[in-house]
Amino acid sequence: ESALKSGVHLLYYSFPKSAKETSDGFEVEITGKSIEKKVFARRVIDCTGNAAFVAMAGYRRIKGSEIQPGTLDFKFSNYNPEKIDKAALSAAYAEALKSGELHPHELWKNINGLIAGGGKGAQHLVGADSSDAFVQTDSNIRGREAFLRLFRFLKRQKGLERIKISYV
């Protein structure tokens, strides 16, 4: 509200394709949902999440020593939580963590919370990076590998043999 009242022009669902600094601002080529347009801006607030505009404008990006992990949301279905032995599932999960098959950051809830909560969960992908398409692709592949490890682990557990992926 404040931004709009102050004369800021917002454009959601778009991202910079190129940026060139001029003597009185920035010439920006943007692309997004059904648009491709060149605009001029006196000032730009880079909200890309990966400082894409900063890099395109020719400035150096500074990456902190710690970056926010990526998040992969998912949901499992086709099981009855009432028929799951929680103690056995917890023990199997603890063993999978101990053996290195699974990693603690790969499941936002505890294993029984995931099952009791209707199968909705999330994984934190430590080291996920979106600074360019190549490293973001690598991050996405690693995230899906972690998700599949969890899915395959669950399918081996009594009462979860027919579990299905509703969405990722």
What do these predicted ranges mean?
Residues 4-17:
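A conserved beta-strand/loop element that lines the FAD pocket in flavoprotein oxidoreductases
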Residues 7-8, 28, 45:
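Hydrophobic aliphatic residue packing
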Residues 12-13, 36-43, 47-168:
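Flavin (FAD/FMN)-binding glycine-rich loop and adjacent Rossmann-like elements that form
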Residues 19-20, 70:
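Short secondary-structure capping/turn micro-motifs that flank functional sites
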Residues 20-38:
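Conserved beta-strand-loop-beta-strand element in the redox core of flavoprotein oxidoreductases
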